[in-house]
Amino acid sequence: MTHPQPFIAVIPARLASTRLPNKPLADLGGKPMVVRVAERAREAGAQQVLIASDAQSVLDAARDHGFEAVLTRADHPSGTDRLAEVAATFGWSDDTVVVNVQGDEPLIDPVLVRDVASHLAAHPDCAIATAAHPIHDAADVFNPNVVKVALDARNVAMYFSRAPIPWSRDAYLPHWPDVSAMPAPAFPVHRHIGLYAYRARFLRTYPSLAQAPVEQAEQLEQLRAMWHGERIAVLITEHAPEAGIDTPADLARVQALFRPGSK
């Protein structure tokens, strides 16, 4: 019998949001969104669930619902930087697996959270694990808001991009630049899922890594790690996860799911 990989779940929760202010505290069936996310992380089997925020109101909401919370600085440029501060505060051992569960994904599948943690443990040569799923629609391939990942033979990431990668020259070039005429991909194309597991030793080094030109160009923080030589193992799942909450319309959609009697 195999035992689940022990891991710690950290939920970065930033109160300031241009599109949806006070997002972590948005009500979902009588509980704040960040608490709903923490419940999912607990269902995944995390040994410890931490909510990390620069806002006292978020910490209070977490503690009111029985979750551990830690105050972090307000000037972090990314969720990974916030996790790095938490890792330094708690002094976790080098091989501790830390999963970054996004604070705006109250419908995240606990099984996926657990599987990404286990995937990192199964790849000792990688500092990070994440997930991706196949996409079959040309509109997704060419959508810059859909992040794609190119993989090697071991499903280790070669590159992440908002551009259509891999580029199928023979299929796409005859139609370029008419994106609407592009055929569906006839080869594997994978959409990145923004769920990460890290080794604590990597988190301690992350803040000292200079930002990479490709990271700044693509606005994808995982490219900083790759730029500095770290490897990212990618777990392939066949199904897309539930979408996170970025806009008032997203919030209304998810709030409806938490109403009594909804399925």
UniProtKB/Swiss-Prot annotation:
Q: Broadest EC class?
A: transferase
Q: Transferase as a keyword? A: yes
Q: From the UniProt record, give the pathway where this protein acts.
A: Nucleotide-sugar biosynthesis; CMP-3-deoxy-D-manno-octulosonate biosynthesis; CMP-3-deoxy-D-manno-octulosonate from 3-deoxy-D-manno-octulosonate and CTP: step 1/1; Bacterial outer membrane biogenesis; lipopolysaccharide biosynthesis
- Which GO terms of the cellular component aspect does the record hold? cytosol
Matches recorded under CDD domains: CMP-KDO-Synthetase (cd02517)
UniProt subcellular location: Cytoplasm
Q: Which domain of life is it from?
A: Bacteria
List the SUPFAM superfamilies hit by this protein, alphabetically. Answer: Nucleotide-diphospho-sugar transferases
Q: Give the record's GO biological process terms.
A: CMP-keto-3-deoxy-D-manno-octulosonic acid biosynthetic process; lipopolysaccharide biosynthetic process
Q: What is its main location?
A: cytoplasm
- Tell me which EC number(s) this protein carries: 2.7.7.38
Pfam families in the cross-refs:
CTP_transf_3 (PF02348)
Q: Which GO terms describe its molecular function?
A: 3-deoxy-manno-octulosonate cytidylyltransferase activity
Which keywords does this chain's UniProt record carry? Cytoplasm, Lipopolysaccharide biosynthesis, Nucleotidyltransferase, Transferase
- Report the catalytic activity: 3-deoxy-alpha-D-manno-oct-2-ulosonate + CTP = CMP-3-deoxy-beta-D-manno-octulosonate + diphosphate
Give the family this protein belongs to, as stated in its UniProt record. Belongs to the KdsB family.
Protein role: Activates KDO (a required 8-carbon sugar) for incorporation into bacterial lipopolysaccharide in Gram-negative bacteria.
**What's the protein name?**
3-deoxy-manno-octulosonate cytidylyltransferase 1
Native organism is Burkholderia ambifaria (strain ATCC BAA-244 / DSM 16087 / CCUG 44356 / LMG 19182 / AMMD) (Burkholderia cepacia (strain AMMD))
